[in-house]
């Protein structure tokens, strides 16, 4: 059965996010029939963290001209028949951790974001905006995958989502902010040029843990020897 529409679930998260991550998963507030159904979750393309969305305040409203809501709604309806997935071809390559449903969900999220930023079908999409949309789409889809992993389904254990910009680009990994800890070392692969290392210490020094980062920058001049 093919569906021509989609659904959006909106609700309040009444518990602390960090606590919920320790004792359960982020789909816990859903009704019992849904909260542990990984097959249902696998069809959710995006989990948007409402706790990161700022509340409305006067600074978010404009005094300039705007579009009437019914006209704007019609514009969005017309955009539904279009796709921006072609903007990804030859420019973005997904990592091996993404399944077929992961790729489908991420592609649709990227397409939707690009349609909001570039309503014109022929408008060229900049590399910066494309990478922003790719990273956001991977994050919101991975948030779904992480909850499936917490429920205990072995098929969802690989959540290391990554992408590469261009055929010669460097593979970059995308994580979800709520899983990161300031005081610990996560299991995420490090960026290129970074490594963790241990120092055994010495007679007057204690053992230590160090994170080494290699950076590249322009030179400051020429030295003649």
Annotated model-derived regions:
Residues 1-185:
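C-terminal regulatory/interaction module of P-loop NTP-utilizing enzymes
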Residues 186-191, 215-218:
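Short, surface-exposed loop and linker segments with low hydrophobicity and enrichment for Pro/Ser/Thr
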Residues 189-199:
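Short coil-to-beta transition motif at edge beta-strands of beta-rich domains
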Residues 197-225:
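Basic/aromatic-rich interaction segments and small domains that mediate binding to polyanionic partners
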């Amino acid at each position: 059965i093919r569906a021509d529409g989609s659904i959006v679930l909106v609700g309040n998260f009444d518990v602390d996010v960090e606590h919920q991550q320790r004792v359960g998963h982020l789909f816990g507030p859903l009704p019992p029939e849904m909260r542990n159904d990984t097959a249902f979750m696998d069809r959710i393309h995006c989990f948007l963290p409402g706790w990161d969305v700022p509340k409305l305040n006067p600074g978010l409203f404009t005094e300039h001209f705007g579009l009437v809501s019914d006209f704007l709604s019609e514009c969005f309806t017309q955009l539904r028949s279009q796709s921006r997935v072609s903007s990804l071809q030859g420019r973005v390559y997904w990592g091996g951790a993404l399944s077929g449903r992961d790729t489908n969900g991420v592609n649709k999220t990227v397409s939707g974001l690009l349609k909001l930023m570039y309503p014109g079908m022929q408008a060229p999409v900049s590399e910066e905006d494309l990478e922003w949309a790719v990273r956001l789409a991977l994050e919101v889809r991975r948030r779904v995958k992480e909850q499936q992993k917490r429920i205990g389904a072995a098929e969802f254990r690989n959540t290391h989502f990554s992408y590469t910009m261009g055929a010669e680009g460097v593979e970059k990994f995308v994580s979800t902010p709520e899983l990161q800890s300031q005081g610990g070392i996560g299991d995420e692969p490090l960026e290129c040029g970074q490594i963790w290392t241990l120092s055994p210490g010495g007679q007057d020094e204690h053992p230590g843990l160090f994170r080494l980062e290699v950076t590249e920058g322009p030179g400051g001049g020429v030295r003649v020897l």
